[in-house]
Amino acid sequence: MHEKYKKQLLILTGMSGAGKTVAAHSLEDVGYFVVDNLPPELLGNFWDLMNTSEDFEKVAVVIDLRVKSFYKDLIDEINSLEDSGQTQATIVFLEASDDTLVARYKETRRLPPLAENGRLLDGIRDERRILTPVRNRSNYILDTSKMTTKELKQKLQSKFGELHKPKFGIEVMSFGFKYGMPIDADIVMDVRFLPNPFYIPELRPFTGLDKRVFNYVMDKDETKVFYGKLLDLLLTAIPGYIDEGKEKLTIAIGCTGGQHRSVSIAQQLARDLSEKYPVDITHREISRYLRK
């Protein structure tokens, strides 16, 4: 990227079906403000607008053959922008082999922009020919034929994400099944099989935040065995979630009402996981049981 300019402009372009949508999301994840499908003739006005704001230091624009007169207008607009001294654009061009693009289009049941009468290969070849001038002008050319989505994301983020590294965090949530499962949970553990303080009259009014309830749940032999295995499982799985680029992992622990067992387990889990990761804890049902 060009360090002399305060704001960075990246133009993401290339063959339809080569992975521009994945690439755009990947750039958003490392701090870029991304605009999709911008007509080339608006590039100059768009950049003027970006320069009026202090909020956007890294900007990416996706431009491809969904807009007409692409090959001519885009190069002209980039040249005009650079000649004015406002910025030095970095052009990233994504491509893939004909066979790969045909396979991807068949999988999605869509057609390339220039395919007429459903002729996939002709449309792909016409697009490749029209985009040649832009490809020749590009700073980076990525062939995604043999890349997985994860590999493309990692390659782009390692190249253009040096100013911003996504932070990983965990939310541990207790809840009650009787009030519905949390729809945003990544991992749900059902602890309704553990001994229930609800049936101990002197513990029933309290929650897992109370030391007596917590100790009752956590000191049971079956809880110790289960919890040890749960913690081992999560410590094994979490690095995989991080490698996949996940920024927030929500672990939900559920019991019947979200009062005793799930709260106790969630408390201990948050405490242990916080030794390695940033952790927030939420007790979804706790307000139902706090003594007024």
Swiss-Prot record:
GO terms for molecular function: ATP binding; GTP binding. It comes from the Bacteria. GTP binds at residues 64-67. ATP binds at residues 14-21. It holds the Pfam family PapZ_C. Keywords: ATP-binding, GTP-binding, Nucleotide-binding. PANTHER family: RNASE ADAPTER PROTEIN RAPZ. HAMAP family: RapZ_like. Displays ATPase and GTPase activities. Belongs to the RapZ-like family. This is Nucleotide-binding protein Ldb0621.
